[in-house]
C-alpha cells in the first residue's frame, strides 16, 4: 500500500489498525539522486540539475506559515525546466516572478532566480563556447581555479551542456544517415528486381511509403521524440533526392545520383562526430588545467558516463582520457561506496537486533 504524504494531498487518511494489519507498509521519501537519474534521462535543463546538486535541500519542501502552504516538488522543477528550455529558444523572460510560478516556495524561488543570473553570467564570462572550440582561455583559468565551489560546479555544468548539444547532434545525424543507408540498399535491390520500371518513379514510391509509415507511427504514438525527429529529417532528405531524379535516367545513373547525395550526408555525420570529439578533447584540456584531479573532474566524468547523449557517443567513439579518468575516478569510487553501504547495513542490523 502506498499513499501520498498528507501535507501534499489532503485526501490522505489514516488506516485503522485492522486494515494496517493486512497491508504491507513501505515508507517512501523523496530522494534527489533517484530523480537526478530521471532528469538526466529526460534531458532537463542543466541549470536545474546543477542547482540541485548544490542545493539538495531545496529539491522537495513543504512548509506552512501565516501566508499558507509554501512548497516545491519534483514536478515543479520539471515544469520549470521546460520553461527554461523554451526561454532559451524564444528569449522569454526569466525572473523571480516567473520562477515563483513553478517553485511555490518564495525562499527557493528567490535563491534559484539569483543562481540563474549567475549561471548565465558564467556562460558569458568564461566563454564556454570558446573553450569548446579550442580558443585561448588563459584569462579565465586563474578565475576558475580561485572560484567558489558553486561557481566551479556551474562551470562544469555549462561545459557539459555545450558538449551534450554536440553529442546529440552527432547522434541525430548518425541516425538519419543510417536510415538513409537502409533506404538506398532497398532502392538498389528494387532496381535489380524491376529493371523495366522508371527509377525516378520507384524512388518516389519509396518516399511515399516512408512518409505514410511515418505518419501512421506518429498517429499511433509509437515514436519517441528523438525517433520522430530523425525520421522526419530522413524523409526531408529522401524527398529532396527524389526531386533531383529526372525521368528517363537509367538504373545506374539514378543510383549514382542518389548515392552522391548520400555521400554528402555521410560527410555531415563525420563532421558532427569530429566536432563533438574535438570539443570533448578541448574540454578535458581545460578541466585538467583548471581542476586537475578535484571533485569537479569526478562530476564531469560521471555525467559523461551517464548522460543519454554522451554515453552512447563515447561507446561508439574512443576517448582515451575519458577511459583513463573513468577507471581512476569512478570505478574505485563505486567500490568504496558499495563497501560503505554494506557497513551501514551492518550497523543498522546491530542497532535493531534487540527488537527480535
Model-derived features with residue positions:
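Short, small-residue-biased leader/transition segments that mark boundaries at the very start
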Residues: 1-3
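Conserved Switch II/interswitch segment of TRAFAC-class P-loop GTPases
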Residues: 6-7
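Short amphipathic alpha-helical segments, especially helix-boundary/capping motifs
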Residues: 10-13, 55-57
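A short helix-turn-beta junction within AAA+ P-loop NTPase domains corresponding to the substrate/partner-engaging
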Residues: 12-33
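Generic structural signal for alpha-helix starts
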Residues: 16, 45-49, 224
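Conserved beta-strand-loop-alpha-helix hinge in the C-terminal portion
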Residues: 35-37
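Alpha-helical lid/collar subdomain of P-loop NTPases
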Residues: 41-201
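Terminal-proximal interaction/regulatory segments of ATP-powered molecular machines
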Residues: 141-356
